Amino acid sequence: MPPATGGGLAESELRPRRGRCGPQAARAAGRDVAAEAVARSPKRPAWGSRRFEAVGWWALLALVTLLSFATRFHRLDEPPHICWDETHFGKMGSYYINRTFFFDVHPPLGKMLIGLAGYLSGYDGTFLFQKPGDKYEHHSYMGMRGFCAFLGSWLVPFAYLTVLDLSKSLSAALLTAALLTFDTGCLTLSQYILLDPILMFFIMAAMLSMVKYNSCADRPFSAPWWFWLSLTGVSLAGALGVKFVGLFIILQVGLNTIADLWYLFGDLSLSLVTVGKHLTARVLCLIVLPLALYTATFAVHFMVLSKSGPGDGFFSSAFQARLSGNNLHNASIPEHLAYGSVITVKNLRMAIGYLHSHRHLYPEGIGARQQQVTTYLHKDYNNLWIIKKHNTNSDPLDPSFPVEFVRHGDIIRLEHKETSRNLHSHYHEAPMTRKHYQVTGYGINGTGDSNDFWRIEVVNRKFGNRIKVLRSRIRFIHLVTGCVLGSSGKVLPKWGWEQLEVTCTPYLKETLNSIWNVEDHINPKLPNISLDVLQPSFPEILLESHMVMIRGNSGLKPKDNEFTSKPWHWPINYQGLRFSGVNDTDFRVYLLGNPVVWWLNLLSIALYLLSGSIIAVAMQRGARLPAEVAGLSQVLLRGGGQVLLGWTLHYFPFFLMGRVLYFHHYFPAMLFSSMLTGILWDTLLRLCAWGLASWPLARGIHVAGILSLLLGTAYSFYLFHPLAYGMVGPLAQDPQSPMAGLRWLDSWDF
């Protein structure tokens, strides 16, 4: 077995020797421990020369890296058609190549890297990525798949090095590497154009870097210490820049940093100036550096996506004015709203659209049978309204009348330009939202009643202020009922042309549903200005993009025929995801974890909680443990505790989320549970060997146990590998299927 054993570690020995970091520290700790163990017990084997140890360490690292790359790149070109979410992220890569603006609920880094990989590998961005099953034909897709597989391949060596540093045991690291190499789920996710391998790459890079800079704690401010601390910050920025799930690894690094600083603060051998330097270094590398890099990804994102595209409508009018090809780009319109102006009014909530009306009436039994008022996502003449004073029908555009600007607090009337009916509300209930009032178009040629009067208010402004196009955020308060004009976002039935419901809500709290801005503005009596002067600043568009992403994330709903899942399903491998194909004639790929690996991980979590609790209670009660048992216990509690914390932080928050969830959300947590399995079983087997030291075969318990786990994991991969690499022919329930007998749960659908 490898020399870095993890056995006999006293508490002080968990810290690497001065002047050594990373693999050097791991090997050195292993040699010192091995020497001490041999002195205590003549039955313990010697592990060979230092040169053999170094060669063995590098050979194992090379082996697990080679196996990881080989499994991830094997049959990477199959199937030659779109699989699962490649339709989204491949399309977004095309948008970057074409510089077309789009909207997504995730930060941009992952998609930018996919687009860059496609561009560098010769993909021209012309494939449509319309739906799963569409063949790539002559389009170059292998560069994007290869990039994702490349990053996914590094998960195994990263986990290997992390466990080696935490446990000082090559066998624990090797077992962890085998679990991830032979997991069909991790393999499947790594072979397609997806964000998951990119996200997991940065998560594992952050975890490894954090563990490495911890191991250099006896050489603070040295070059290796700065390198690993800075690399931790870079990796945190990468994880957050791909998905907001990166917040969980940020939390883990933050908790580790707080504990580290607390320990340093209590070290009376350090001056407060030195503690301050430690604090400053961590602020710079773990806060300032990640924030700067994260912000830079958005700067590049906005710079590259400069053309109008399918994402325009999710953003404010001022944001859209930045995009070439948008009707607001380089446009010139009057800056301040005046009576007589023809305007369009856009709701600030994502994907709600413009205030709209048409000649169709509400049907019988749906409030008053008056003209429908809705919101509509697209540009249309029926979005045009004329703003008038509430108490006069005179034409404000008459040259004899002076220009009068609309101000915050004015009482106004909105007349629909195409039908000459006024925006109107009353105490009739809205068509779809209970306790909200109906909004209609009412009157003839602009003549109606007092239910047509609205007070216009600018959010967070004083009375008398003028109203700016694009920039002013306004609300319309109904004068008679006191309700606020808004859109519920609910889709009307076919009688409403499946447009969105407009209501007047009696709840006056400011929400995006009830806040609007003026977009188009026509008034021949006013001078035009270029909208360039009204474009938002970078901090404003950065903030807006995050608000839109957060709202989009929370509002995600499952698509038709889509397999969603619950968090409790995930650790037990309850149900997978179809990546490709359904019928026996299709090329089928099914995302499912290797059940042997996943159920072993689940058992390991339970065993860790039990054994860790027993050890912690014994140590707290002052039990005198033999040196080797004490050292192994420290490895289990400290190293295992680190990865258990990672599993907890990457798993349990999903129970609190209201959005739709999918099986693949568990895979970052699965990486941590696999590392815990490696540390736990290596430690337990060593403890068993120590406890049975008087038995002649005790020396082989650890070796036999690790080999059994390695061989069992490899054999299970042999059985289940068609799930990842693809299968054609009878389904698993057919006795003729190569997967017959392997459908161990009825919920597995392959």
Curated annotation (Swiss-Prot):
The keyword Metal-binding applies. It catalyses: a di-trans,poly-cis-dolichyl beta-D-mannosyl phosphate + L-seryl-[protein] = 3-O-(alpha-D-mannosyl)-L-seryl-[protein] + a di-trans,poly-cis-dolichyl phosphate + H(+); a di-trans,poly-cis-dolichyl beta-D-mannosyl phosphate + L-threonyl-[protein] = 3-O-(alpha-D-mannosyl)-L-threonyl-[protein] + a di-trans,poly-cis-dolichyl phosphate + H(+). It is a multi-pass membrane protein. Its EC number is 2.4.1.109. Residues 1-23 are annotated as: Disordered. One of its GO terms (cellular component) is nucleoplasm. CDD domains: beta-trefoil_MIR_POMT2 (cd23282). The modification Phosphoserine is found at residue 41. Glycans are attached at residues 98, 330, 445, 528, 583. Pathway: Protein modification; protein glycosylation. Highly expressed in testis; detected at low levels in most tissues. Pfam families: MIR, PMT, PMT_4TMC. One of its GO terms (biological process) is basement membrane organization. The keyword Nucleotide-binding does not apply. Slightly activated by Mg(2+) and inhibited by both Ca(+) and Mn(2+). EDTA ha no effect on activity in vitro. Keywords: Congenital muscular dystrophy, Dystroglycanopathy, Endoplasmic reticulum, Glycoprotein, Glycosyltransferase, Limb-girdle muscular dystrophy, Lissencephaly, Membrane, Metal-binding, Phosphoprotein, Repeat, Transferase, Transmembrane, Transmembrane helix. It is found in: Endoplasmic reticulum membrane. InterPro entries: GlyclTrfase_39-like (IPR027005), Glyco_trans_39/83 (IPR003342), MIR_dom_sf (IPR036300), MIR_motif (IPR016093), PMT_4TMC (IPR032421). One of its GO terms (molecular function) is metal ion binding. It comes from the Eukaryota. Interacts with POMT1. Belongs to the glycosyltransferase 39 family. It is linked to Muscular dystrophy-dystroglycanopathy congenital with brain and eye anomalies A2: An autosomal recessive disorder characterized by congenital muscular dystrophy associated with cobblestone lissencephaly and other brain anomalies, eye malformations, profound intellectual disability, and death usually in the first years of life. Included diseases are the more severe Walker-Warburg syndrome and the slightly less severe muscle-eye-brain disease. Transfers mannosyl residues to the hydroxyl group of serine or threonine residues. Coexpression of both POMT1 and POMT2 is necessary for enzyme activity, expression of either POMT1 or POMT2 alone is insufficient. Essentially dedicated to O-mannosylation of alpha-DAG1 and few other proteins but not of cadherins and protocaherins. This is Protein O-mannosyl-transferase 2. It comes from Homo sapiens (Human).
